[in-house]
Amino acid sequence: MNASATQATEIWPLVAYFFLVVMLVVGVMALSYIIGERHRSKATDEPFESGIVTVGLARFRLSAKFYLIAVFFVIFDVEAVFLFAWAVAFRELGWPGYIEAIIFISILGAALAYLWRLGALDWGPPRHSAGRFAKDSRSPNHAVVSK
């Protein structure tokens, strides 16, 4: 038996599986088209909100800080993955691996310190000098802008 015949006998289950998956997808989509309802009404293009009547538009602005936090999460999540892989292979990597991990952590720490210093992590209102805001007698945490 030659090499191409051996390869063909080894790959036929994969080809058969692929063919069956494609046939199943086509069959389900055809069945959905045949059985499904075809009516157009005003409510057809509206999203279903569990029986609650929609009010207003769904489009509203989100602060860019939400996206910034998502980016921070991704960065430090990837850092955790790299450090976990480093910890698993710690004995094989030796001192060079340890030094590389320290450099990696230092670069990410410097980036975090830079962003913190830049104010990228401040969620509250901007801090002002004490002369511009005066304490109000109504609440200890309530400030009124003096004119």
From Swiss-Prot:
**What does the UniProt keyword field contain?**
Cell inner membrane, Cell membrane, Membrane, NAD, Quinone, Translocase, Transmembrane, Transmembrane helix, Transport, Ubiquinone
Say yes or no: keyword Membrane present.
Answer: yes
**Name the UniProt record assigns to this protein:** NADH-quinone oxidoreductase subunit A
Q: How does it sit in the membrane?
A: Multi-pass membrane protein
Function according to Swiss-Prot or TrEMBL: NDH-1 shuttles electrons from NADH, via FMN and iron-sulfur (Fe-S) centers, to quinones in the respiratory chain. The immediate electron acceptor for the enzyme in this species is believed to be ubiquinone. Couples the redox reaction to proton translocation (for every two electrons transferred, four hydrogen ions are translocated across the cytoplasmic membrane), and thus conserves the redox energy in a proton gradient.
Q: What is its EC number?
A: 7.1.1.-
Gene Ontology molecular functions? NADH dehydrogenase (ubiquinone) activity; NADH:ubiquinone reductase (non-electrogenic) activity; quinone binding
State the similarity comment. Belongs to the complex I subunit 3 family.
Which Gene3D superfamilies does the entry link to? NADH:ubiquinone/plastoquinone oxidoreductase, chain 3
Q: Which species does this protein come from?
A: Nitrosospira multiformis (strain ATCC 25196 / NCIMB 11849 / C 71)
Q: What is the lineage of its organism?
A: Bacteria, Pseudomonadati, Pseudomonadota, Betaproteobacteria, Nitrosomonadales
Q: What is the protein's major site of localization?
A: membrane
Quote the Pfam families the UniProt record gives: Oxidored_q4
Q: Which HAMAP family match?
A: NDH1_NuoA (MF_01394)
